Structures are given as C-alpha cells and as structure tokens.
Amino acid sequence: MKENNKFNFVLHRENFLTPEQCDELIRKFEESKPQKSGVAGTYEGGEINEKVRKVQEVRLQNDVVLSDGFKLTKHITMACEMANLINFNFDLEKPYQLEDIVLLRYENTDKYDWHLDIGKNETSVRKISAIIQLSDEQDYEGGDFEFSIANDEGDDNYFGTRKRGSLILFPAFLGHRVRPVTKGVRYSIVTWILGDAFR
C-alpha cells in the first residue's frame, strides 16, 4: 500500500484574488438575478430547505475571465492540480474538470449547516472543494467557515480563513458548515474539481 505522508485536510492560499478582483465578482453577483440555493444531491437541481441551507447564489459559465485578463477558471483549476499533486494525491485525470463557479451571498441569518460536498447522483463525482472569500472580514459578523476536524491546538473544530481573496481547498468528503451571518454580508465562491467516484 502506498502511504501519503504529506496529506492535510485543509489548504489555504492567501491573496489568490486581489481586492479589485473580489469587488468585480461581487458586482457580477449584484448585477445578476440571484436564486435561492438548494441542497445538492438530486438531479432536479437541489431541494430548497432553509432549515439546512439559506443563501442566495449566481452560477457563472465556465471559462470566467475578469476584466484585468485574470482567467479565474484556469487559476482555480491550476491551484487544485498543484494541491492534488503535492497534498491530496487523489486519482484525477487530466485535464481537470471544474463544476460551475457559484457566487454566494450570505446575509441576515443565512447559513449552511453541517454537510459534505459529495453524495449521491451528480455530487458523487466531486473530489476537491474550492472556496474563495470575497468579502473583507470586517464586513460581516458570524458566517464562520468551520470544518469538523480538530485544529492544531486540539480544539473541537477548525475554521477556514476569513481573509479576503483567500482560496480554501479541501476534500469533498470533509464535513463543514457556514455559521449564520449575524451582521453585514459575506460573499464567497464555491466550485469543485470533478473525477470518477472514490473507490
């Protein structure tokens, strides 16, 4: 059996996006027609269940290019490829395939309770989850991104970074949640690298 001695559950990359790029993506959200996000795992697009998930979303087409020429889709894919090569070591075929990029807006008690990004049906092919923080951490209260693993100090759960422009990568099978936003607005991106189901 081959071991993976470099594995970490959660990877952070600060300054993945500039503040200007974050602002542009927030504007894209506000200029679009957001919809309520469903709970994934059905081919019908996800059941709306606000007891579990309450957030607005805008789905972007693939190959998202920002006004400064930054190829968002390409850079997320490259970051996931490097993370997989160095850290996760999942069985993924090249070229890596990315699911839709989804812009999210959490406000006024919006949340997403404990869940996995992988499940049945269309979510069964998710391998690596990617989150980008678009809001400044001073712009909202609550809304912490929390994982169901202990941190280095042995505390019960581990929190993702709140720093603006940061990329967070983790396996789709890792439990996580977004705590309710109690003040202000939290914008973020979520997407997934896809591959054959884990075996």
Task: Walk through the language-model features, giving the residues of each.
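Non-heme Fe(II)/2-oxoglutarate
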Residues: 2-95
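Catalytic core of non-heme Fe(II) oxygenases with the double-stranded beta-helix
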Residues: 70-73, 77, 81-199
